[in-house]
């Protein structure tokens, strides 16, 4: 019971440091202290206190490490993993689209090109920088352009959720081992798993991979994790799926009803009848809710789910996210870059990849 209580304490502490939903977290404080690179010596755009404004925010050692990891992995993946994707997620507001679909009402419009371009400017991971020992700063774009075609460029927003679960799972596992556990499996948020040793009967730890085309409890496969040592598993997926089961999206005045035959359940038929589509260069722009942070638009990779086993939960999380956007990413190259940054041996392997159904 002592191990369980200690692990729960780690989860709570990390939540306090990194949750974007807690105003006092270090991530929220960085977001509240977005500093301009323009005149005024980096004065806070959001009116933060003088201990933060213009000088950056001093963070804990763990946050400092996680931020350095985030930037290293953003660079290693060519931006396919991006801890500053928040403005783009807000611009697309897929949660609202999904809510409308579930309610059986017309979907809200997709963002205009100007809105996407403005959000893309605020989503550059280069806006986050380490300006001193454990001191970090988040800046607005420094090109003196405050709007795109009349659309204001939003403030950048950091969110470490893409790798924090993996870090937390590893930390909990390591603590359990340090306290005497001979075998451990830690699962954080259902998508991040860290293991050590074996099960009580000596067999390897196994983890089921959800089937994104099936129901909530459907399993696409089972992964047997390396026995005896430590390993981390991350699964990233399009949990919403193609809205209504078709590759389409509402797009305001440019939209029209989806053409062609309609098949499937009553719910799918109703959704398809209310969906609208936007074309870009002759193709539909919306496959699912996963946004490509490099383009600002939903990814067209044709992948619904990716699972990665790696030597680090942070590495596994970033890779599974990046591969969902671009499955052509050179995994060995990312691993080699990561090993150089951390100074420790690293490994990663894709153990599950589910393609989107065509329909």
Question: Locations of the language-model features?
Answer:
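Mature catalytic core of soluble alpha/beta enzymes
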Residues: 1-359
């Amino acid at each position: 019971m002592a191990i369980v209580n200690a692990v729960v304490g780690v989860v709570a502490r990390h939540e306090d440091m990194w949750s974007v939903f807690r105003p006092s977290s270090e991530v929220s404080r960085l977001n509240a202290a977005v500093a301009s690179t323009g005149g005024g010596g980096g004065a806070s755009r959001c009116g933060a206190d003088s201990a933060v404004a213009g000088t950056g925010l001093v963070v804990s050692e763990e946050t400092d490490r996680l931020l350095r990891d985030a930037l290293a992995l953003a660079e290693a993946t060519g931006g396919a993993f991006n801890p500053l994707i928040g403005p783009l997620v807000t611009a697309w507001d897929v949660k609202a689209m999904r809510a409308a679909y579930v309610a059986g009402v017309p979907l809200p419009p997709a963002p205009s090109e100007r809105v996407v371009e403005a959000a893309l400017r605020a989503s550059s991971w280069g806006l986050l920088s380490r300006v001193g020992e454990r001191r970090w700063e988040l800046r607005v774009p420094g090109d003196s352009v405050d709007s795109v075609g009349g659309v204001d460029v939003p403030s950048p927003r950091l969110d470490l959720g893409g790798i924090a679960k993996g870090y937390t799972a590893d930390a909990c596992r390591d603590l359990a081992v340090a306290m005497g556990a001979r075998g451990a499996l830690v699962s954080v948020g259902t998508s991040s798993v860290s293991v050590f040793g074996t099960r009580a009967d000596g067999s390897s730890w196994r983890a089921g991979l959800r089937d994104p085309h099936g129901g909530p409890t459907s399993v696409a496969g089972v992964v047997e994790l390396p026995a005896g040592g430590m390993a981390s598993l991350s699964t990233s997926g399009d949990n919403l799926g193609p809205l209504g089961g078709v590759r389409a999206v509402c797009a305001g005045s440019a939209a029209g009803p989806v053409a062609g035959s309609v098949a499937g359940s009553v719910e799918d038929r109703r959704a398809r009848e209310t969906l609208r589509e936007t074309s870009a260069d002759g193709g539909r722009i919306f496959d699912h809710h996963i946004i490509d942070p490099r383009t600002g638009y939903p990814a067209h990779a044709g992948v619904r789910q990716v699972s990665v086993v790696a030597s680090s939960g942070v590495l596994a999380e970033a890779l599974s996210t990046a591969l969902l956007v671009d499955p052509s990413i050179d995994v060995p190259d990312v691993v080699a870059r990561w090993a150089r940054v951390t100074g420790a041996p690293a490994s990663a392997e894709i153990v599950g990849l589910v393609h989107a159904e065509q329909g």
